[in-house]
């Protein structure tokens, strides 16, 4: 009967509770009645509220992190301690030098003719060169092939022009002058018998050539106008010398 009476009182009080009152207050006010009853076989027992005991602080209140620094006269900022790395032994040091990749070094002055490899860039970008200068090695045979060939004279003309255009030794170097000593006179340009005969015929016909006639003779004999002009000048000087020597005899 006591259990039924407490249950009826609990439900009656919960129904009659006013709207303005806190429902939690009325609920907790009847805990003293409900705590006296024994739990039934289908009900869970009610446990008292848990109370935790406060744990003692890890550090005492008298300890302060800055008191030791201030007493010792050290700066307040804390710098972490970084241990120094131990020096490896000689065997491991040499082994690491073999394993590590050697860095790319700048080309030495003696290595200027080596072509630098381009560096790989991102997709869509042209490769960049490190050295920035590209040297092209060209042989003497390739240089002769690439050089332009002048259109045409015979073998005697090529010999004459080659002798005139030959580069002499360095004038500032006395040893070169002594080693390559030669006469200052240029090599004479030989003419063929056919060219000499035609020039003699033209000279007997006219000692002085006009510009148009000189151009035509040079074209027919495969000579330059300068060669024809010089030959006529020499031939006139030779004839004057012969005319001067004839009266004396």
Swiss-Prot record:
Residues 184-243 bind DNA. It is found in: Nucleus. Pfam families: Homeodomain, Hox9_act. Residues 152-169 have a biased composition (Basic and acidic residues). GO terms for molecular function: DNA-binding transcription factor activity; DNA-binding transcription factor activity, RNA polymerase II-specific; RNA polymerase II cis-regulatory region sequence-specific DNA binding. GO terms for cellular component: nucleus. Sequence-specific transcription factor which is part of a developmental regulatory system that provides cells with specific positional identities on the anterior-posterior axis. This is Homeobox protein Hox-B9a. It comes from Danio rerio (Zebrafish).
